[in-house]
C-alpha cells in the first residue's frame, strides 16, 4: 500500500517568527519508527512537506527512512490560517496524493497492516463532546461551504491513520475540508474548527455518498494495551514535562531501530549529531 507522512512548518513559523525550525527528539524518533515499520510491512511511504520541512529532514539526516520526499505543501498553506488550522497541510497533502492511499501521522505506528479493501479506514471514532465538537451553528464562516444533507449526529473519525480507497471521494472530502478552512473566521476555540474540518466532515461526507467506513481501534478501548497499532500522541504530551521519561523513551526508540531495522542504525548517529 502507498502511504504518506506529512509535515507543514507554517504553524511553527506563525507562532515563532524568526526562529529556526526544530523538531523534538521524541517526534523525530516516532517519525523514524513509523516510516520504517510501514516499509517493513511491505509498503511504500512518501514524506509530503513544504520547503522548510524538506531542509529540516535533510539536516537531520533522515531522508532515507522514506521512499521519497516531495515538496507539495505551500509554505503559506495557500491562504489557510496556520494557527487556526495547524494540520491544514495534512489535508492539502492528502488532496495531492493519489488513492488508494494511507495517510499516517508521524506518531502513529502500524505494526500489522489492516485489510485494505473498499471501505475507508480511520484510526478510531470519537465521542461528540460539545467542548470539542460544538453545534455547527457556532462556526463563523464566509459564504455557504457546508453541503446539505449532512448528518450531524455522526461520530467523528480520528485521522491519525486514514485509508481512502477511492480518488473521487478523496477529492470531494479534501475540497470540502479545504473550503471550510479557507472560509472560517475566528470566533472561538481553534481546536473546534480544526477537528471539524479534519475529523467531523469525513464520516458525514462518506455517509452522504453512501461509502462505508471502519476503524482500526475501538474508541472505548483506546487506553488498553494494543499490539497492532500504537498512537504516541498522549505519551509525547507527558514527555514534554518529564525529561527522565523523555530520555528513557528515546533510548527505547534507539533500541527498537537497532533490533528491528538494523540496516538503518546509521540514522541514529545522524540524528544525534544533528541534535548536538
Walk through the language-model features, giving the residues of each.
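Hydrophobic anchor at the start of a short beta-strand
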Residues: 44-45, 101, 211-214
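Conserved catalytic core of nucleotide-sugar-dependent glycosyltransferases
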Residues: 115-182
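A short acidic (Asp/Glu
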Residues: 16, 56-60, 113-115, 201-205
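N-terminal anchoring/stem segment of glycosyltransferases
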Residues: 1-77, 233-276
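Short, polar loop motifs at secondary-structure junctions
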Residues: 50-55, 105-112, 219-220
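Catalytic core and acceptor-binding pocket of nucleotide-sugar-dependent glycosyltransferases
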Residues: 152-240
Amino acid at each position: 500500500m502507498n502511504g504518506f507522512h506529512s509535515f507543514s512548518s507554517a504553524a511553527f513559523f506563525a507562532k515563532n517568527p524568526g526562529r529556526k525550525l526544530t523538531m523534538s527528539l521524541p517526534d523525530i524518533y516516532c517519525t523514524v519508527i513509523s516510516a520504517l515499520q510501514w516499509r517493513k510491512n511491505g509498503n511504500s511511504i512518501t514524506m509530503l512537506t513544504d520547503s522548510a520541512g524538506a531542509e529540516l529532514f535533510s539536516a537531520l539526516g533522515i531522508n532515507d527512512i522514506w521512499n521519497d520526499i516531495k515538496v507539495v505543501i505551500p509554505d503559506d498553506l495557500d491562504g489557510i490560517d496556520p494557527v487556526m488550522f495547524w494540520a491544514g497541510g495534512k489535508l492539502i497533502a492528502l488532496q495531492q496524493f493519489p488513492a488508494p492511499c494511507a495517510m499516517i501521522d508521524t506518531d502513529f505506528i502500524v505494526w500489522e497492516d489492516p485489510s485494505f479493501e473498499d471501505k475507508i479506514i480511520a484510526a478510531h471514532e470519537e465521542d461528540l463532546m460539545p467542548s470539542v465538537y460544538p453545534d455547527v451553528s457556532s462556526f463563523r464562516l464566509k459564504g455557504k461551504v457546508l453541503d446539505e444533507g449532512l448528518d450531524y449526529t455522526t461520530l467523528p473519525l480520528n485521522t491519525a491513520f486514514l485509508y481512502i480507497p477511492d480518488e473521487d471521494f478523496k477529492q470531494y472530502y479534501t475540497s470540502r475540508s479545504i473550503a471550510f478552512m479557507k472560509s472560517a473566521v475566528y470566533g472561538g476555540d481553534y481546536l473546534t474548527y480544526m477537528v471539524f474540518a479534519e475529523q467531523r466532515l469525513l464520516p458525514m461526507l462518506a455517509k452522504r455518498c453512501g461509502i462505508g467506513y471502519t476503524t482500526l481501534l475501538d474508541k472505548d478501548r483506546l487506553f488498553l494495551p494494543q499490539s497492532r497499532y500504537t498512537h504516541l500522541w498522549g505519551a509525547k504530551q507527558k514527555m514534554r514535562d518529564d525529561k527522565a521519561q523523555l530520555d528513557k523513551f528515546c533510548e527505547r526508540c534507539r533500541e527498537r531501530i537497532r533490533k528491528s531495522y538494523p540496516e538503518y542504525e546509521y540514522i541514529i548517529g545522524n540524528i544525534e549529531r544533528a541534535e548536538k
